Amino acid sequence: MVHLSADEKSAINAVWSKVNIENDGHDALTRLLVVFPWTQRYFSSFGNLSNVAAISGNAKVRAHGKKVLSAVDESIHHLDDIKNFLSVLSTKHAEELHVDPENFKRLADVLVIVLAGKLGAAFTPQVQAAWEKFSAGLVAALSHGYF
């Protein structure tokens, strides 16, 4: 797993303190579903996802985006044990939901875009490097149930 220094943990927590779990989760999931439309197949129960307006205005997209970022929030509280913390969620996505684990990386990538847009100049290269390292650990932990 990924080892984070004290400075990296501090940067991750500083970024996360500025996140609005509901709004930023909605933005990240909306971006995922628009930019990577094939991911919509995992959300067939969400109803109309036919265009940007439908996705953006979908209450189930908003609720699931909040759920996703709530899991990220909890993971940040378990930085030293993300793999074990996310083991049940990883197994669920692998065995029950059959989500392609590449989509965890895609979601991590769109979350970086949302965070960069939100933080602007405060999302420095050093902050991004710490966040990317955390994201890699998160993706690895979520993918663990597949292998």
From Swiss-Prot:
Pfam families in the cross-refs: Globin
Disulfide bond positions: none
Domain named Globin: residues: 3-147
GO biological-process terms attached to the record: hydrogen peroxide catabolic process
InterPro entries: Globin (IPR000971), Globin-like_sf (IPR009050), Globin/Proto (IPR012292), Hemoglobin_b (IPR002337), Hemoglobin_oxygen_transport (IPR050056)
Domain of life: Eukaryota
Keywords on record: Heme, Iron, Metal-binding, Oxygen transport, Transport
One GO CC annotation: hemoglobin complex
Binding of heme b, residues: H64, H93
Cleavable signal peptide: none
Keyword Heme tagged: yes
Tissue expression pattern: Red blood cells.
Protein name (database record): Hemoglobin larval subunit beta-1
Record-stated family: Belongs to the globin family.
Function: This is a larval (tadpole) beta-globin.
Record keyword Heme present: yes
PROSITE patterns in alphabetical order: GLOBIN
Summary of subunit composition and partner proteins: Heterotetramer of two alpha chains and two beta chains.
